[in-house]
């Protein structure tokens, strides 16, 4: 069972040894960070500063969402002890984590508190992504 906490600009979702932070980062911008560390880094990894914006959070047992403008990100428990992360634009599903057991995400420890993360997503056939990721 997950533990979900509301923050100043989103939610923190904890399940087993993973910590997922979903934040409204500006109008129509949602930032998601995932770690196996006990806390999230305060390091500024993004190119943009956080913008003040209106957003909504909704938390129920085993499920939470953050909405900023036309975007919504939702995370929910799955029966086998994993979670599904979904993204919506104008209430229409555009992307979600692949639903095939808990091995759709892989964490490789690199050094110190750093991990390389690989996550499998199911996207729509007409969806294209450019410039994702940071190394």
Where do the language-model regions lie?
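N-terminal accessory segment at the very beginning of proteins
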Residues: 1-135
């Amino acid at each position: 069972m997950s533990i979900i906490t509301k923050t100043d600009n989103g939610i923190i979702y904890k399940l087993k040894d993973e910590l997922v932070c979903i934040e409204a980062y500006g109008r129509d911008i949602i930032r998601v960070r995932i770690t196996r560390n006990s806390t999230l880094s305060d390091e500024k990894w993004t190119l943009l500063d956080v913008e003040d914006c209106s957003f909504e959070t909704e938390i129920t047992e085993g499920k939470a969402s953050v909405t900023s403008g036309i975007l919504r990100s939702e995370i929910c428990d799955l029966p086998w002890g994993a979670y599904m992360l979904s993204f919506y634009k104008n209430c229409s599903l555009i992307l979600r984590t692949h639903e095939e057991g808990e091995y759709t995400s892989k964490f490789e420890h690199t050094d110190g508190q750093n991990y390389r993360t690989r996550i499998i997503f199911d996207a729509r056939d007409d969806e294209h992504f450019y410039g994702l990721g940071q190394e």
